[in-house]
């Protein structure tokens, strides 16, 4: 086992204000503990939430902030009480790096619903030090919140599964929507949505992609394997699809109407919200009453579910569709993501970007 230094200086790319612009930043990692692992970051996916946080869309951002919560790296040191991992293991770190371990969600192993969870960035750890994410050379993480990347899964492919992949896998499992033959829809074809198509198809579902235009039809059906494509602005097609779906996985991260989609659900159908939306959504109650339909939500997934989806993707031969970029391109990547100009997930090659070298003259804390 490697020995742990109490503190260490590392380099990340941080936003310093609500412009969301990232630049090199040198900071001190939190003190390490006996159950901590030190992870050299190899790759980190870019999620739409990174934009929300970096630009303070949710009104709770603290700066400087190093984003990134789809982290894949190599264990380089372990604490004396670490039992799950060893030096050289390739591991993943997701959205959460701490929880209370005492509440009902924690005891049920769905720690993502713990009211005292600690986010992997833009939060404060138990020692009072800010948490910083995976757009950095190194992270220190408690072993409970680390997952081993299975053999057969490339690290850059694994990164989006730590958020986008488990975000669609978790509600399908939690709401009993894993039975082959179900008819489901994925609303929105971005980073989360494209994994939704792949995961649902691998479960044996008939999958419809719903989008606002026809421009993604060929991608959805020819490349991702969707069974049908529905344009939400096509009133005739929407009417023809009424009462046809067991579920809708709604990945749209901006305000949108719900009523057109509720009409597509069968009796007892579920509309599952996954997008982080800061404005109220509205519907009239008969839309759910006259069909015993449910509007519900789901938030990422547990550590156990994340490990499950990683293995599920290996077993089913699933990969995420990614564009790998260097850290120096991260601001352009964030801009493109905000314009929905990516198919379908950016992944930053952190280890290959020499972030330590480019930060020689960077400001520090």
Swiss-Prot record:
Pfam families recorded: ADH_N, ADH_zinc_N
Taxonomy, superkingdom: Eukaryota
Catalytic reaction list: (E)-cinnamyl alcohol + NADP(+) = (E)-cinnamaldehyde + NADPH + H(+); (E)-coniferol + NADP(+) = (E)-coniferaldehyde + NADPH + H(+); (E)-sinapyl alcohol + NADP(+) = (E)-sinapaldehyde + NADPH + H(+); (E)-4-coumaroyl alcohol + NADP(+) = (E)-4-coumaraldehyde + NADPH + H(+)
Keywords: Lignin biosynthesis, Metal-binding, NADP, Oxidoreductase, Zinc
InterPro entries associated with the record: ADH-like_C, ADH-like_N, ADH_Zn_CS, CAD-like, GroES-like_sf, NAD(P)-bd_dom_sf, PKS_ER
EC number: 1.1.1.195
Binding residues annotated for Zn(2+) 2, in chain numbering: 100, 103, 106, 114
Bound cofactor: record note: Binds 2 Zn(2+) ions per subunit.
Binding residues for NADP(+): 49, 167, 188-193, 211-216, 251, 275, 298-300
Cofactor (UniProt): Zn(2+)
Family, similarity comment: Belongs to the zinc-containing alcohol dehydrogenase family.
Protein name per its UniProtKB record: Probable cinnamyl alcohol dehydrogenase
Origin species: Saccharum officinarum (Sugarcane)
Gene: CAD
């Amino acid at each position: 086992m490697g020995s742990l230094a109490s503190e260490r200086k590392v380099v990340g790319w941080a936003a310093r204000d609500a412009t969301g612009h990232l630049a090199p930043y040198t900071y001190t990692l939190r003190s390490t503990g006996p159950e901590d692992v030190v992870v050299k970051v190899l790759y980190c996916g870019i999620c739409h939430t990174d934009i929300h946080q970096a630009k303070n869309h949710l009104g709770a951002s603290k700066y400087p902030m190093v984003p990134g919560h789809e982290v894949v790296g190599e264990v380089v040191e372990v604490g004396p009480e670490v039992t799950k991992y060893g030096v050289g293991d390739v591991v993943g770190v997701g959205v959460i790096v701490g929880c209370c371990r005492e509440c009902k969600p924690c005891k049920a192993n769905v720690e993502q619903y713990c009211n005292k969870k600690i986010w992997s960035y833009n939060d404060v750890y138990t020692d009072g030090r800010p948490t910083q994410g995976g757009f950095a050379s190194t992270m220190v993480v408690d072993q409970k919140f680390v997952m081993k990347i299975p053999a057969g899964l490339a690290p850059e492919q694994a990164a989006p599964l730590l958020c986008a992949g488990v975000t669609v896998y978790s509600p399908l499992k939690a709401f009993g929507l894993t039975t082959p033959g179900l008819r489901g829809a994925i609303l929105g074809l971005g980073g989360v949505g494209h994994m939704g198509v792949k995961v649902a198809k691998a479960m044996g579902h008939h999958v419809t992609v719903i989008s606002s235009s026809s421009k993604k039809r060929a991608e959805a059906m020819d490349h991702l394997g969707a069974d049908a494509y529905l344009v939400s602005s096509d009133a005739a097609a929407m009417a023809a699809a009424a009462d046809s779906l067991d579920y809708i996985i709604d990945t749209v991260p901006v305000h949108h109407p719900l009523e057109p989609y509720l009409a597509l659900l069968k009796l007892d159908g579920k509309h599952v919200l996954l997008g982080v939306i800061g404005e109220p959504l509205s519907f009239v109650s008969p839309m759910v009453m006259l069909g015993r339909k449910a509007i519900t939500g789901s938030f990422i997934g547990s550590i156990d579910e994340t490990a499950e989806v990683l293995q599920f993707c290996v077993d089913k031969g699933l990969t995420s569709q990614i564009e790998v970029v260097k850290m120096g391109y991260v601001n352009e990547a964030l801009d493109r993501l905000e314009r929905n100009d990516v198919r379908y997930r950016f992944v930053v090659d952190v280890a290959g970007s020499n972030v330590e070298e480019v930060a020689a003259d960077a400001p520090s804390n």
